[in-house]
């Protein structure tokens, strides 16, 4: 199954999620967005904290990013490669509150690696929160991962591989679109996009 998720839906859900975190008393010192997927939602959450803390004595929430990806090596082991941090975890101190933001928790390998890496620099697990728009619980897989999202907008229970869903985030994804999907989700709203998409090699 494939779902097209409009950016307005992600924006509104991100605002509600940020409000929930704030009402529960969680104000991060640092927000790390996972590029690319976490950027849009992270921007919204960052803006919420900037607005809600304006005029208070609370220090601003620092906004940063990490580029990381999971892959399967030649021995079929899941590995994670980190291409860079805009704010080095070496600067974190015990007691710092950290928020990781991503669009989806799917395999979970990348976020597990990143959270464990941050904990190796001092912050404790209770001071690190993971927020995602979509949290996929793949019951048919035996992953045995310790780090799962603390906050999410939607939770999907996937009991079998045939039940898997492909979520297309319209805020930043273009690859994998059929002619029918382009027509329905892009050209119907703005016919000028036909020319834009004509130079894209699928």
Label each region the model flagged.
Residues 1-27:
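Active-site-facing substrate-recognition patch
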Residues 23-25, 49-58, 87-90, 119-125:
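Alpha-helix termini
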Residues 26-35:
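Short glycine-rich phosphate-binding loop at a beta-alpha junction
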Residues 27-28, 93-97, 125-127:
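A general structural motif
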Residues 54-98, 106-116:
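Short, glycine/charge-rich flexible loops or terminal/linker lids adjacent to PRPP-binding catalytic cores
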Residues 65, 100, 130-132:
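Structural beta-sheet core signal
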Residues 116-202:
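PRPP-dependent phosphoribosyltransferase catalytic core
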């Amino acid at each position: 199954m494939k779902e097209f998720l409009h950016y307005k839906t992600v924006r509104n859900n991100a605002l509600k999620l940020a409000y929930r975190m704030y009402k529960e008393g969680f104000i991060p010192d640092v927000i790390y967005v996972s590029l690319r997927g976490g950027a849009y939602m992270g921007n919204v959450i960052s803006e919420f904290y900037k607005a809600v803390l304006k005029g208070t004595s609370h220090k601003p929430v620092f906004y940063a990013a990490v580029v990381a990806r999971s892959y399967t090596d030649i021995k079929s082991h899941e590995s994670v490669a980190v291409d860079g941090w805009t704010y080095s975890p070496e600067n974190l101190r015990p007691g710092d509150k950290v928020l990781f933001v991503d669009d989806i928790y799917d395999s979970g390998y990348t976020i597990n690696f990143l959270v464990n890496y941050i904990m190796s620099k001092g912050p404790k697990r209770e001071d690190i929160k993971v927020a995602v728009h979509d949290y996929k619980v793949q019951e048919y897989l035996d992953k045995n991962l310790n780090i799962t999202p603390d906050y999410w907008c939607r939770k999907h229970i996937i009991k079998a591989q045939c039940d898997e869903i492909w979520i297309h985030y319209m805020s930043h994804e273009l690859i994998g679109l059929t002619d029918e999907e382009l027509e329905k989700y892009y050209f119907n709203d703005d016919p000028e996009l036909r020319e834009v998409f004509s130079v894209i090699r699928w």
